[in-house]
Amino acid sequence: LPAIAEEPPQRVRAWLVVPGEAELRDQAVLKLPKGYRFLGGQETQRLLKQMGNFPSGAELGLITATAENEQWFMVVRYIDAGYVKDDEAANWDADALMTSIKEGTDEDNKTRQAQGFPPLVIRGWEEKPHYDKAASKVVWAISAQERETVGVNYNTLALGRQGYLSMNMVGSLEQLPVLKPHVGLLLSNVEFIEGKRYTDFDSTTDKVAAVGLSALIAGAAIKSGLLAKLWAFIIPLVIAGKKLLMLLVIALGGLAAKYFNKKPKPEQAGGGGGLSS
């Protein structure tokens, strides 16, 4: 990753590790508990791009744990798709969804191979999709294999009045028992603000999304850059016992170790994600 390592450190901001609230555009707030780091949107987009991914511009930040033995990360995005109807959630067919995901991945593999990436083989559900209607939130997990590497993509959606938040976590399959509590905590700590909540929807004025929850689940699995591209860089290092956080330090332009060993002052993060204590 020479291009990443050569990135000037003065262009990079430190991780925000102070417990507080990360503002997710003008839509929602993420309460960041002790033990987590948050990287702003602009830095996250640059990091993803430098690691071979193609950011959509919807990235608001990246979350990881402060503990060095916690080798995972989560990317937070907001998609201004409109109000996503949840009426089909009660009749989900998980097997049919998985078939759709595998078919879409087979097609996407043609593009991956043309770009020099090995094909991705979807193994199946590690956690079938389930919808919390009261909270308007969805959780599911899929495992996939790339060469000898098996990874897990843990996906969550939080539905709002004008769109939805996607919180996408990547880790190795053996980490699954460790990932699940983080997913639950972080998802429960994100809430849309008043006027932007799912229950604030006004059918007379608000835009309705062109797709439903099933399409979002299938599309997120097939088209997620994290599932399809970042594993080629990150998960092999995790499997080899190397530290994900050290890779991120290099990727962010050689950030000094002091950023990980002392408590920085709160500051605004770029790209729509800010942290306040």
Predicted regions span which residues?
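Short, well-structured beta-strand
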Residues: E6, G116-D200, T204
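C-terminal single-pass membrane-anchor helix
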Residues: A209-G274
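N-terminal leader-region detector that preferentially activates on the first domain or presequence
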Residues: N155, L186, A269-S277
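Short aromatic-glycine motifs in intrinsically disordered, low-complexity regions
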Residues: V18-K31, E174-L185
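Solvent-exposed, polar/charged alpha-helical surfaces in well-ordered, non-transmembrane soluble domains
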Residues: L30, K34, D95, T99, ...
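Proline-anchored loop/turn motifs at beta-strand termini and strand-loop-strand connectors
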Residues: R25-A28, L32-Q42, L187, I193
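Conserved polar/disulfide-associated segments of primarily extracytoplasmic proteins
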Residues: E6-A28, Q42-V152, K207, G212-A218, ...
